[in-house]
Design a protein with these regions (language model features):
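Hydrophobic alpha-helical segments typical of transmembrane helices
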Residues: 5, 24, 63, 90-93, ...
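Short amphipathic alpha-helical segments
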Residues: 6-7, 30-32, 68-71, 94-97, ...
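Residues at the starts of beta-strands that form the adenosine-phosphate
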Residues: 15-17, 81, 103
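Rossmann-fold NAD(P) dinucleotide-binding segment
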Residues: 40-99
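Internal alpha-helical scaffold of NAD(P)-dependent oxidoreductase catalytic cores
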Residues: 48, 93-103, 119-140
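NAD(P)+-binding Rossmann beta1-loop-alpha1 motif at the extreme N-terminus of oxidoreductases
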Residues: 1-50, 117-118
């Protein structure tokens, strides 16, 4: 789902994207190198994470605990939002596992969203700002 959504987002030409995927790094790098998408094979550092306005977790639920632990102690910008499309993982999962995350949103896209024709359900925590809600609405 993550790759398909990225394809749809690239067609919007509104944002630039970086992808972190240690498991599929080579294939993604080959696929997206012409689209100016930066592909990384390791978790960003604390200083690198501060450059992101939106962090989207689009991973399989069975690896969620392992992946999220790598972000556990990061300090995020106050206006950054962490979005998740991980099946079955509620906002509380992120609140418990990423202690410095402030703005959180759970997104449930449907398949037509992959071609910018669908609807997505968003639920954010109480800190999820209207400004970030507009950004998330645009990409989902």
């Amino acid at each position: 789902m993550g790759s398909a959504l990225l394809d749809a987002w690239l067609n919007l030409k509104l944002y630039s994207f970086d992808v972190i995927d240690p498991f599929n790094f080579k294939n993604l790098n080959k696929k997206y190198s012409k689209n100016k998408v930066k592909i990384f094979n390791k978790t960003p550092t604390q200083s690198e994470i501060k450059k992101y306005d939106i962090i989207i977790f689009a991973i399989k639920p069975q690896v969620a605990n392992k992946v999220i632990q790598q972000y556990k102690n990061f300090e995020f910008k106050k206006n950054s939002v962490i979005a998740s499309i991980i099946a079955g993982k509620k906002i509380l999962f992120f609140k418990r596992n990423i202690k410095n995350a402030i703005q959180l949103v759970r997104v449930m896209p449907n398949m037509p969203a992959l071609i910018n024709q669908g609807t997505s359900c968003l639920i954010g925590n109480k800190y999820f700002t209207k400004s970030n809600q507009k950004k998330i609405n645009i990409i989902f």
